[in-house]
């Protein structure tokens, strides 16, 4: 399943990020991809050795960790270190699949269950640059407002279409979820959303408490910690 997570960064945060990224050191984006991806990847990424990168990636981690909808949808166990990319002048990233595992600075290795893109450019400021994701439900084309995030299974083939005008800047990362299975994770997310909706409409009740108990028992049964 694919999820749109709005408002991960405020407009003020986005403006500050963009101003700082204007001063960043950018390198060839192929430095962080494997052999298959390198054949179809043509973009730039912020140099991960810079002091600015360390500060910005930490802010992204703080923002997603504090976002309730992101947590409910992803049920994250481990987050990769966020990266930042830039597309301009017809740069693109052809169809590819993300690696199943990635190295992690604290955990050694992590499984990539979910991929996330946090948009940092106003969609009206550039042409092209759509994230295209192929999954079992068909093809999805995504171009979100700056500050919004899209979450989708890392097992999906995906690409970024050529940016023919302007500049597309984004942050991206991978998530190892406590729930490995996409279908089980989607069911828990739907159940959680319905519980929250019922609570806001009717207040606390025995029935809602029973549903909450069911949610946590399923999470206990399916989670890998």
From Swiss-Prot:
Segments forming domain Fe2OG dioxygenase: 78-177
Coiled coil region boundaries: none
UniProt superkingdom: Bacteria
Record's keyword annotation contains Metal-binding: yes
InterPro entries in the cross-refs: Oxoglu/Fe-dep_dioxygenase_dom, PKHD_C, PKHD_hydroxylase, Pro_4_hyd_alph, Pro_4_hyd_alph_FE2OG_OXY
HAMAP family linked to this entry: Hydroxyl_YbiX
Name this polypeptide is given: PKHD-type hydroxylase YbiX
Annotated source species: Escherichia coli (strain K12)
